Amino acid sequence: MNFPSITKKEFERNLSSNFSFENQPYIGICVSGGSDSMALLLLMKEWIKKLKGKILAIHFDHNLRVESNLESKVLEKKVKKLGVDFTKITWNHNKIDSRILEIARNERYKKIISLCKKLKIINLMTAHNLDDNLETFIMRKKRDSISLGLSSIPKIRVVDDLRIIRPLLIYEKARLEATCKKSKIQWLIDRSNFDERFERVRVRNFLKSKSVKCIHSINSELNKRKDVNLAKEKKILKFFCKELRFYDYGVFEICREKFNKLSITLKIEILKKILTTAGGKDFSPKRKSILFFLNLEKSN
């Protein structure tokens, strides 16, 4: 199946329909050198001219592979050849034996967010695409079948006053590759993307083995889940506005009578959000921990 490249007009419509920006925006773009981020850079390079803004390609060298430093130099030349400013962040660390992807991801976001604050960048784009979204959906589905997190990767996420924007979530990876090919842009290939020790790689290979019809079915399920979760989010927001009080030192108060009338699903998600915020954590507690707490509270 041949996938068409993404046109300038198509991309412009996507941005204007889903996102808003300040006048003459300064936007950071996470660039790994893969087809996804190179396609995003190409599309943004044209779009930003209309707003008279500027973009900065931000590359994070995880320093996990011997060839990563050489790849960074090759990438810098490619980006500068496109007329885009480039900056590199190198992660210096000791050997990591476990939870490599999780630790690397957390460190990457931490350092990139810090750089954006320093440069007064309030919008950061990443090149997550439809394939990534489906992979994440399947991975989360295996872990937690009813969580709001199952709706997968959000278009916009705000972290420390920085908007993390993902404008490519509606596009297949094949279309991003076609976009690079049309502009004769070669992308880098990370060999870790083929290492089946990582769950995401195994899920990716699983999806590759499925028919187009099956992929469409999974995507349809994902979209339905988004609609269901949006309705849940509205109910949670309504509860927070009416029944939640926050105090100093992470203390919160909710109306027990109103809380007890909610469904178990809403109770779990409400407590997840409260505890994540009160604890200053990036990730919410596990569902089984919340259930244990609810059962304990019920017995008292």
Model-derived regions, located:
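Hydrophobic/aromatic-lined pockets within catalytic cores
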Residues: 142, 211, 275-279
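Conserved anion/nucleotide-ligand pocket segment
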Residues: 204-218
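AMP-forming adenylation/ATP pyrophosphatase catalytic core
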Residues: 2-36, 54-56, 91-96, 107, ...
